[in-house]
Amino acid sequence: MNFTAIDFETANCARASVCAVGLVRVENGKTVAEYNTLINPETYFDWRCVNVHGITPEDVESAPTFPKVWKEIKPFLSDNVVAHNAPFDMSCLRAALAEFRPPDASEFDYICTLAISRRLFGMGGNRLNELAEKFGLNSFRHHDAFEDAAVCAEIFKIFETRTDVSAFKKRFIPPF
């Protein structure tokens, strides 16, 4: 299956406060495109979020805002999108889109690797870093948006060999 793995980090608990995004495009089992950027959320940073991902207000001062980033990431979101804990990432995307309402936002299918993991392995040990360790992919910086997306892509490729991942598809519908 061709897909794009995506991960967002947020500045605070508001889903629209995206401050980083990482994407990895996989076609025929090979990475064909990548995108990684900090995003200026134009809002405050909660210290708890900074403690998780390490991104500070100073880091994003000269970063593009989400409307500029949207133009870059939109081509990645054409068919199957994969994320670990996809409800979080899809809610970030939905909230960010709701703020500026781009005319080119469209529907796409998405799949959650956390949901697949819970089905395959039960309820314990399903965090991204735990799965990475389980599959020997443990040399990554957890909560770095790009590295999380890259590891998610590798985990999804493993899951494709173990189950019918298409059974986990859901539909992303823009908020307007």
Indicate where each model-derived feature is located.
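Short, conserved phosphate/pyrophosphate- and ester-handling motifs at nucleotide-, phospho-/glycolipid
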Residues: 148
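Conserved non-catalytic scaffold segment of RNase H-like nuclease domains
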Residues: 1-107, 122-143
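Conserved beta-strand -> loop -> alpha-helix junction used to position metal-binding or nucleic-acid-contacting
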Residues: 104-117
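Short Asp/Glu-rich motifs
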Residues: 69, 151-152
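Buried hydrophobic packing segments
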Residues: 93, 116, 152-156
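Short, glycine/acidic-enriched loop or turn micro-motifs at the edges of active sites
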Residues: 10-12, 115, 151
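Acidic two-metal-ion nuclease catalytic site recognized across multiple nuclease folds
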Residues: 153-176
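Generic structural signal of hydrophobic/aromatic residues within well-ordered alpha-helices
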Residues: 49, 73, 116, 165-169
